[in-house]
Regions:
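Bacterial Sec-dependent N-terminal signal peptides
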Residues: 1-54
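N-terminal leader/propeptide segments of preproteins
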Residues: 50-67
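A short, N-terminal "cap"/entry segment at the start of jelly-roll beta-barrel domains
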Residues: 67-134, 145
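Double-stranded beta-helix
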Residues: 176-199
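Conserved metal-binding segment of the jelly-roll/cupin
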Residues: 198-219
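A short hydrophobic beta-strand segment most commonly corresponding to one strand
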Residues: 205-206, 224-238
Length: 238
């Protein structure tokens, strides 16, 4: 019994090191904007909708500023091959770009000027930065063989340049960590019926921030599961 208690305390301590991974704070914030009205129906609706990313709806000026910034396009730094997928949290993108412009500029400059189909597979340094691009020639797999994850210290920039990769984003309200936080990743048990799925093609890129608990390389509905995807981990700035 004492050993089990120590293990439980150890897991709790590990999770406490990664506040972005615990659903409670995110869920309470998401529900509070609705539930402060003290209506059971409103609370029920909030839970039914789920929580899939950081919520900024209580700051409409910030949301509008982020949308305007994205549309203006200076962030592209010459990159015009693809746009952000509709699931990308534009406020997180906007805020993180302002806090860490050097890495983001280097990222977009590199993928704008590089033939991403011709570059050899493997990891390559991005000039003028401490970033590394991982060029992965891989295959999608059935959902049950893929794990969910999120990261606290890094942001996943993922861009499929060949083929179709299916991504999943899981609901915070019905998910819970199933392991210790190991820098810089944690995994979850989740309700598949509450997950949202998106197919990524070469005209869109995805960005997964700490509040985006995701699943990658899920099999799509076609006969071809071969993909080439680039993954760049950008530092997350508090």
């Amino acid at each position: 019994m004492k050993k089990m208690r120590l293990m439980s305390l150890s897991l709790m301590a590990a999770l406490a090191m990664a506040p972005a991974f615990t659903a409670s704070a995110q869920c309470k914030k998401a529900e509070s904007s609705c539930c402060k009205k003290n209506t059971d129906a409103c609370c029920k609706d909030a839970k039914q909708e789920g929580v899939y990313t950081q919520d900024y709806s209580n700051d409409p000026k910030l949301v509008k500023a982020a949308q305007k910034w994205y549309k203006k396009g200076k962030w592209r730094n010459g990159f015009k091959k693809a746009d952000a997928h509709s699931s990308v949290n534009l406020v997180d993108f906007y805020l993180q770009y302002q806090k860490n412009p050097e890495q983001w500029k280097a990222l977009f400059d590199f993928i704008a000027k590089t033939d991403l189909l011709a570059i050899p597979g493997g990891k390559h340094p991005i000039p003028g930065s401490n970033l590394t691009i991982s060029v992965e020639d891989s295959k999608n797999n059935p959902l049950e063989k893929r794990g969910s994850e999120s990261h606290y210290h890094h942001i996943d920039f993922q861009y499929v340049v060949k083929g179709v990769e299916r991504f999943g984003i899981i609901d915070h309200l019905t998910s819970k960590p199933n392991c210790k936080y190991r820098p810089d990743v944690i995994h979850y048990d989740y309700d598949k019926s509450r997950a949202r799925f998106y197919d990524s093609t070469p005209d869109k890129f995805f960005i997964f921030f700490p509040g985006d608990w995701h699943i990658a390389k899920i099999a799509n509905d076609t006969d071809n599961q071969d993909i080439r995807v680039i993954v760049i981990k950008v530092d997350y700035k508090d």
